[in-house]
């Protein structure tokens, strides 16, 4: 008995990877996500490899996870994958206290983010035999 299996939210030619609670602000993470949005996965991986942003290594790992999910779980062709979506969401915000002069205190906020990457298999254009 039990509950029926939920329908798949993505199309049959898509796979995704989600990384939650990353210790970086969503605004900074979105700069790196925008760098790979809409690109082929090989180009996106090389862009992340040589990016100077601190978080680019973490985003690269998540993209590699999405590629592995596409290959192993959904039998998609790795060479025909593009980054269909790369979006960032807000997570928790840790609040910390910072002692200031004259006995006062101020608040330091340490934001966290969520990252979702969706890769899609596209057919190559111009391969008419």
From Swiss-Prot:
One annotated GO biological process: translation
CDD domains registered for this protein in UniProt: Ribosomal_L22
Protein origin, superkingdom: Bacteria
Descriptive protein name: Large ribosomal subunit protein uL22
Family note: Belongs to the universal ribosomal protein uL22 family.
SUPFAM superfamilies given in the database record: Ribosomal protein L22
Role this protein plays: This protein binds specifically to 23S rRNA; its binding is stimulated by other ribosomal proteins, e.g. L4, L17, and L20. It is important during the early stages of 50S assembly. It makes multiple contacts with different domains of the 23S rRNA in the assembled 50S subunit and ribosome.
Record-linked PROSITE patterns: RIBOSOMAL_L22
GO cellular component: cytosolic large ribosomal subunit
The keyword Zinc belongs to this UniProt entry's keyword annotation: no
Keyword RNA-binding on entry: yes
Keywords: Ribonucleoprotein, Ribosomal protein, RNA-binding, rRNA-binding
GO molecular function list: rRNA binding; structural constituent of ribosome
Family annotation (InterPro entries): Ribosomal_uL22, Ribosomal_uL22_bac/chlpt-type, Ribosomal_uL22_bac/org-type, Ribosomal_uL22_CS, Ribosomal_uL22_sf
Record note on quaternary structure: Part of the 50S ribosomal subunit.
Pfam families: Ribosomal_L22 (PF00237)
């Amino acid at each position: 008995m039990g509950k029926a299996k939920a329908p798949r939210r993505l199309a049959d030619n898509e796979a995704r990877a989600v990384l939650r609670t990353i210790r970086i602000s969503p605004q900074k993470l979105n700069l790196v996500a925008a760098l790979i949005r809409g690109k082929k996965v090989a180009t996106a991986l090389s862009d992340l490899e040589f990016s100077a942003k601190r978080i680019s290594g973490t985003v690269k790992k998540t993209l590699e996870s999405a590629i592995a999910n596409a290959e192993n779980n959904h039998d998609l062709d790795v060479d025909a994958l593009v980054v269909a979506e790369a979006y960032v969401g807000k997570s928790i915000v840790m609040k910390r206290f910072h002692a200031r002069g004259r006995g006062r205190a101020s608040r330091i906020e340490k934001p966290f983010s969520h990252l979702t990457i969706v890769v899609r298999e596209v057919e190559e254009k111009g391969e008419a035999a």
